[in-house]
């Protein structure tokens, strides 16, 4: 990207309006330009025919619409798409589209790698490099919308839902994520309703409080354990923000909208968090919480110490929660044949921590000493 030019994908509508006014342009031009970029999907200013030649020339000199580069695209047997996107810095992130009969969900990344270290997630083993810019986040939506349209020659609105559940912890990139979600919900851009944009967090309490004040999007919490002792192992940020704080906030998160509920995500790990006593503990934990629970069959990745719970175990767990009035569903595994399922996204990360090197060392050890059983704790790879 030309360092002298501003990338317009970093601007929401109001910011774009202010930018054009600073360039001595009429405010109404912002709406036209915003729609060209996001609704029509045009990057070439020369093709924005209702802007006027003088403005088009000015935009060509001062601005650009720079996107991540698609370096690979895979399509699963079930129709799931996964794109590997190269950033200007050389790192790569992944974006996934999951088609269903009446909806299409785009799973969007927020960081290069992840700043957290959940023990059951492949992204965490890649380490962390940096936060994504607003342009790199909304650029995933822009690219997916164009790719899906171009592939079958239609211009139907295929992306009906966006989930901030890709690589990274969204709330540790608060400003850029909120800015991108605002563009997603803008009627001049992608026009998604607040109930169709979901942010998933591991429980960064201060930023959850901020999000509640400034954004109406749906909230999902990566819970995965019903006690602090177990969650400390699976989701280490729990040591800083324990369940008592997390559940207290979730109880009042949608207090002004009593019909809305917090979704609690719970990965099913064989013999770890899937036993009847865990279900009983979860029922007690979520008492009086406006909640729905999403059970996620574990999706394996190299060197993981975990296994997926059996279908019978998952069904029994779900049924027990349902009998106690907790709305519970089991997420259908999609895209696992191309490593696009929940917890499998990895990308290509130039790790600025030592986490990926430690993980690779452990992987090498497991290959060279098959006689030694390798047990990995979250502390060892933090």
Swiss-Prot record:
Cofactor(s) this protein requires: [4Fe-4S] cluster
Cofactor note: Binds 1 [4Fe-4S] cluster. The cluster is coordinated with 3 cysteines and an exchangeable S-adenosyl-L-methionine.
Superkingdom in the source lineage: Bacteria
Residues where [4Fe-4S] cluster binds: 114, 118, 121
GO molecular function list: 4 iron, 4 sulfur cluster binding; metal ion binding; rRNA (adenine(2503)-C2-)-methyltransferase activity; rRNA binding; tRNA (adenine(37)-C2)-methyltransferase activity; tRNA binding
Family: Belongs to the radical SAM superfamily. RlmN family.
Cited NCBIfam families: rRNA_mod_RlmN
Task of the protein: Specifically methylates position 2 of adenine 2503 in 23S rRNA and position 2 of adenine 37 in tRNAs. m2A2503 modification seems to play a crucial role in the proofreading step occurring at the peptidyl transferase center and thus would serve to optimize ribosomal fidelity.
Entry protein name: Dual-specificity RNA methyltransferase RlmN
């Amino acid at each position: 990207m030309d360092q002298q030019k501003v990338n317009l994908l970093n601007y929401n509508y109001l910011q774009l309006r202010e930018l054009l006014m600073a360039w001595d342009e009429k405010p109404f031009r912002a709406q036209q330009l915003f729609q060209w970029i996001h609704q029509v999907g045009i990057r070439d200013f020369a093709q924005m025919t209702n802007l006027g030649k003088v403005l088009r020339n000015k935009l060509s000199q001062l601005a650009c619409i720079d996107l991540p580069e698609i370096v690979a695209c895979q399509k699963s047997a079930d129709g799931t798409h996964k794109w590997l996107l190269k950033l200007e810095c050389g790192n790569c992130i992944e974006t996934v589209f999951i088609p269903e009969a009446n909806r299409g969900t785009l799973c969007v990344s927020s960081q290069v790698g992840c700043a957290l270290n959940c023990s059951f997630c492949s992204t965490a083993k890649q380490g962390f490099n940096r936060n994504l810019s607003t342009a790199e986040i909304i650029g995933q939506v822009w690219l997916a919308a164009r790719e899906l349209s171009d592939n079958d020659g239609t211009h139907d609105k295929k992306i009906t839902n966006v989930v901030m559940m890709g690589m990274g912890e969204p709330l540790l990139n608060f400003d850029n994520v909120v800015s991108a979600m605002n563009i997603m919900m803008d009627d001049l851009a992608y026009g998604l309703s607040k109930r169709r944009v979901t942010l998933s967090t591991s429980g960064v309490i201060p930023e959850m409080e901020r999000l509640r004040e400034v954004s109406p999007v749906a909230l999902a919490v990566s819970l995965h354990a019903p006690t602090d002792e177990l969650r400390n192992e699976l989701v280490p940020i729990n040591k800083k923000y324990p369940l008592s704080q997390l559940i207290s906030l979730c109880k009042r998160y949608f207090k002004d909208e009593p019909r809305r509920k917090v979704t609690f995500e719970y990965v099913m790990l064989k013999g770890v968090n899937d036993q009847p006593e865990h279900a009983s503990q979860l029922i007690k934990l979520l008492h009086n919480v406006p909640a729905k629970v999403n059970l996620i069959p574990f999706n394996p990745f190299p060197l993981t110490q975990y296994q997926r719970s059996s279908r019978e175990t998952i069904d029994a767990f779900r049924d027990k929660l349902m009998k106690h009035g907790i709305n519970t569903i089991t997420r259908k595994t999609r895209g696992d044949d191309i490593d696009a399922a929940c917890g499998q996204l990895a990308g290509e990360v130039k790790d600025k921590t030592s986490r990926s090197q430690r993980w690779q060392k452990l992987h090498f050890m497991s290959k060279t000493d098959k006689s030694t059983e390798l047990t990995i704790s979250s502390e060892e790879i933090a």
